[in-house]
């Protein structure tokens, strides 16, 4: 909504433009009228819409055409004043003023016009019969008001309607020729309906209607008022009410009715509450609220955000199988202007074995990934879902936790983070993709079913360490000789080499020495494809000796060529190293240290599976 309103009064000489302005200010008819009134400003606290309003007078005697054109360009709304007792001034509305104004404004963004019939005290008839055909001819005319500066009739209403034409314009909402709402308005209201339909049954029940009424208008509807609304819809739309709930068709009919009855401020209140601007686009302020992220800090979803996303998942998981089918996912994203997830997402997070559909855990993981890698996009997505409205928060920023500086974690030897990034490094063909897919529980046979164009360079899943659920985010970095700064920023590094390729380990050594040897980032060497015949690596010392020399844990044997899911031991170790980068080399070598971490992972994985089964049974 505009922060202020600028009203320009134009019209033929002596129709009473200046008198109208002066009578509004002084509350009485001026005996002496100057050729032109000075610009006046009405403070926000004395206007119904609480917006400061500037009223500008135009005088043909004192101003030239260039000054008139400038005032037109600055105005938000123009009042064309005519005298009801002067036919010539009425004729000039269409022969002079409307064409002149339209020539000076863009065709796609015409200024709203108010026709003002002044001096109604001098006649006993109305000019409306003459004016109505003009209003029907020009869609930019918002309304017509007959008034009298002399007896103060309707002069306050005149400026109220002018202000309303700017703050609650009819043009973007409604097409008078077709007598129906415009497509952009229907699209916006349809999104609002889908967000408000919290149980996804295609209707707004009484609880949903009351919630909608409260968040938009700050007041609930009385039960009788609710029934009255539904009865109006029933009488006018055959399928506007179903199972005693308001359908989308009924919802759209109500807003059409509001607009037709001149109550378009009601529709605008709803649209603006859900983030729309005057062009029916979601505002940048709504989609991208301010969120300060200091250096060396990361972004995560907080508990309230996860609860919200759980409710969104439940809303669209219609068959209650704890996975979203392609149709269910498409239905979920109907409130988005585009499909945000591509086929690579299915290879980034966990899917079910039946149809390769994104599971409940995979759904939350993808949101966690987006929040960590691109928090602005996460804010945008939460905005499309209506987070701030449904969660009754000021903005989506309240869904985000900004972690503390990593240097503080190192000093205190503990972290509050829940998401840890591991960069997976290795030469092409060494098995990095296998490591990523193994995090999602996929063996080599399942990995071979992935199409090349759907490959993902990220994988994310939960890992349990000492009974704590954490997210491990794996990133397959490029296999170039020199990594970019962005490719070296992480919490832990996984150096992968192929045991069957004699040149594979040497690449890991070069990358380690160039980027990580002098850093405080812990590194773990993974001997991939351990099911194959191991050959001697073409490097001066063996991988085991290299790890010992640089105070790293010994190389971890790994293969995804298994009958069942690959082992998750390396993921527990990587997450543990990321959580406790200060742990000494002696601790890292201790079997007891890893046993405690792995035991916690096993216990909580079992508990998680039991809770998952209970959830399915309960639902």
UniProtKB/Swiss-Prot annotation:
<dbReference type="InterPro" id="IPR020860">
    <property type="entry name" value="MIRO_dom"/>
</dbReference>
<dbReference type="InterPro" id="IPR027417">
    <property type="entry name" value="P-loop_NTPase"/>
</dbReference>
<feature type="binding site">
    <location>
        <position position="323"/>
    </location>
    <ligand>
        <name>Ca(2+) 2</name>
    </ligand>
</feature>
<feature type="binding site">
    <location>
        <position position="434"/>
    </location>
    <ligand>
        <name>GTP 2</name>
    </ligand>
</feature>
<feature type="binding site">
    <location>
        <position position="529"/>
    </location>
    <ligand>
        <name>GTP 2</name>
    </ligand>
</feature>
<keyword id="KW-0472">Membrane</keyword>
<feature type="topological domain" description="Cytoplasmic">
    <location>
        <begin position="1"/>
        <end position="593"/>
    </location>
</feature>
<feature type="binding site">
    <location>
        <position position="433"/>
    </location>
    <ligand>
        <name>GTP 2</name>
    </ligand>
</feature>
<dbReference type="GO" id="GO:0003924">
    <property type="term" value="F:GTPase activity"/>
</dbReference>
<feature type="domain" description="EF-hand 2">
    <location>
        <begin position="304"/>
        <end position="339"/>
    </location>
</feature>
<dbReference type="GO" id="GO:0005741">
    <property type="term" value="C:mitochondrial outer membrane"/>
</dbReference>
<dbReference type="InterPro" id="IPR001806">
    <property type="entry name" value="Small_GTPase"/>
</dbReference>
<keyword id="KW-0460">Magnesium</keyword>
<dbReference type="InterPro" id="IPR013566">
    <property type="entry name" value="EF_hand_assoc_1"/>
</dbReference>
<keyword id="KW-1133">Transmembrane helix</keyword>
<dbReference type="GO" id="GO:0097345">
    <property type="term" value="P:mitochondrial outer membrane permeabilization"/>
</dbReference>
<dbReference type="GO" id="GO:0047497">
    <property type="term" value="P:mitochondrion transport along microtubule"/>
</dbReference>
<feature type="binding site">
    <location>
        <position position="18"/>
    </location>
    <ligand>
        <name>GTP 1</name>
    </ligand>
</feature>
<comment type="subunit">
    <text>Homodimer.</text>
</comment>
<dbReference type="Pfam" id="PF00071">
    <property type="entry name" value="Ras"/>
</dbReference>
<feature type="binding site">
    <location>
        <position position="203"/>
    </location>
    <ligand>
        <name>Ca(2+) 1</name>
    </ligand>
</feature>
<feature type="binding site">
    <location>
        <position position="448"/>
    </location>
    <ligand>
        <name>GTP 2</name>
    </ligand>
</feature>
<feature type="binding site">
    <location>
        <position position="321"/>
    </location>
    <ligand>
        <name>Ca(2+) 2</name>
    </ligand>
</feature>
<feature type="binding site">
    <location>
        <position position="150"/>
    </location>
    <ligand>
        <name>GTP 1</name>
    </ligand>
</feature>
<dbReference type="InterPro" id="IPR052266">
    <property type="entry name" value="Miro-EF-hand_domain"/>
</dbReference>
<comment type="similarity">
    <text>Belongs to the mitochondrial Rho GTPase family.</text>
</comment>
<feature type="binding site">
    <location>
        <position position="18"/>
    </location>
    <ligand>
        <name>Mg(2+) 1</name>
    </ligand>
</feature>
<feature type="binding site">
    <location>
        <position position="319"/>
    </location>
    <ligand>
        <name>Ca(2+) 2</name>
    </ligand>
</feature>
<keyword id="KW-0812">Transmembrane</keyword>
<feature type="binding site">
    <location>
        <position position="560"/>
    </location>
    <ligand>
        <name>GTP 2</name>
    </ligand>
</feature>
<feature type="binding site">
    <location>
        <position position="119"/>
    </location>
    <ligand>
        <name>GTP 1</name>
    </ligand>
</feature>
<feature type="binding site">
    <location>
        <position position="208"/>
    </location>
    <ligand>
        <name>Ca(2+) 1</name>
    </ligand>
</feature>
<feature type="binding site">
    <location>
        <position position="149"/>
    </location>
    <ligand>
        <name>GTP 1</name>
    </ligand>
</feature>
<keyword id="KW-0342">GTP-binding</keyword>
<feature type="binding site">
    <location>
        <position position="197"/>
    </location>
    <ligand>
        <name>Ca(2+) 1</name>
    </ligand>
</feature>
<dbReference type="GO" id="GO:0019725">
    <property type="term" value="P:cellular homeostasis"/>
</dbReference>
<keyword id="KW-0677">Repeat</keyword>
<feature type="domain" description="Miro 1">
    <location>
        <begin position="2"/>
        <end position="168"/>
    </location>
</feature>
<feature type="domain" description="EF-hand 1">
    <location>
        <begin position="184"/>
        <end position="219"/>
    </location>
</feature>
<feature type="binding site">
    <location>
        <position position="19"/>
    </location>
    <ligand>
        <name>GTP 1</name>
    </ligand>
</feature>
<feature type="binding site">
    <location>
        <position position="59"/>
    </location>
    <ligand>
        <name>GTP 1</name>
    </ligand>
</feature>
<keyword id="KW-0547">Nucleotide-binding</keyword>
